[in-house]
């Protein structure tokens, strides 16, 4: 599937680039890569997930054609309150788009187009676990993520078009593990995966511009599986 290929390709690029930089730094023994009390950091990461499918059986429906992408840009900054521990705040923007045609239970072709975007804020705490001299470190980020967003979905049937507009708030409390690889005393590559933990979504929906009959939907869940498909890659500066 396309999104697996994309993530594998990006992951291989990240690892190969990291190895090149690490091989060029021959004097790493003289450098101090530790995250010590009083240090600051700032980072910029990016994630992309895309999927293209044709004539695929997705268990609950037969998909004729599907085209989806989802990306996020995240800026993060923080301060080390003690060795190997930081407190910070991240801000991000995400956008998702999907166009899918599938066969419903009546054998009718249905086309759905959905667009969603949102802004996120998340206070967070990071714990670093140095490996060896600390040029490579395991990162565990705990965060409370709040996303404010909007969505628009249009569903096209043979004799009907339905439009659903939504405003939502997403709350997520959980952990996001990752790795940090320093290629300089101050600069590092960072990669993290999707949050595992508690989530809640509150959304108000308006169907076909009928604002007098708006619906309020509340969803909550617990998921402690690490989402390896949501891979964030970026660069950080420590000073």
Segments predicted by a language model, with ranges:
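Short glycine/proline- and aromatic-enriched beta-strand/turn motifs that initiate or cap beta-hairpins
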Residues: 22-87, 223, 228-239
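Transmembrane beta-barrel strands of outer-membrane/channel proteins
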Residues: 44-50, 89-95, 140-148, 179, ...
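Bacterial Sec-dependent N-terminal signal peptides
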Residues: 1-27, 235, 239
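Gram-negative (and chloroplast) outer-membrane scaffold detector with strong preference
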Residues: 78-158, 166-170, 187, 226-239
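Outer-membrane beta-barrel translocator domains and adjoining extracellular loop/strand segments
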Residues: 54-61, 99-108, 150-161, 202-210
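Predominantly the C-terminal beta-signal and adjacent terminal strand-loop region
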Residues: 178-239
């Amino acid at each position: 599937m396309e999104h697996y290929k994309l993530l594998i390709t990006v992951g291989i690029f990240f690892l190969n680039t990291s190895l090149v930089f690490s091989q060029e730094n021959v004097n790493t023994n003289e450098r101090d890569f530790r995250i010590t009390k009083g240090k600051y950091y700032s980072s910029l990461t990016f994630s992309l997930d895309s999927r293209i499918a044709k004539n695929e059986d997705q268990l609950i429906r037969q998909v004729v054609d599907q085209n989806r992408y989802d990306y996020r840009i995240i800026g993060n900054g923080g301060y080390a309150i003690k060795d190997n521990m930081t407190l910070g705040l991240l801000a991000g923007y995400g956008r998702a788009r999907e166009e899918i045609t599938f066969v419903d239970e009546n054998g009718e072709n249905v086309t759905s187009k959905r667009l969603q975007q949102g802004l996120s804020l998340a206070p967070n705490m990071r714990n670093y676990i140095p490996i060896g001299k600390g040029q490579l470190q395991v990162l565990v980020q705990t965060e409370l993520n709040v996303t404010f967003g909007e969505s628009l979905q249009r569903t096209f049937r043979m004799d009907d078009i339905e439009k659903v507009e939504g405003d939502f708030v997403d709350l997520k409390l959980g952990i996001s593990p990752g790795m940090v690889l320093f290629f300089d005393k101050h600069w590092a590559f960072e990669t993290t995966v999707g949050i595992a933990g508690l989530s809640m979504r509150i959304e108000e929906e308006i169907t076909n511009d009928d604002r007098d009959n708006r619906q309020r939907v509340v969803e909550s869940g617990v998921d402690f599986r690490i989402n390896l498909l949501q891979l964030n890659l970026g660069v950080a500066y420590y000073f």
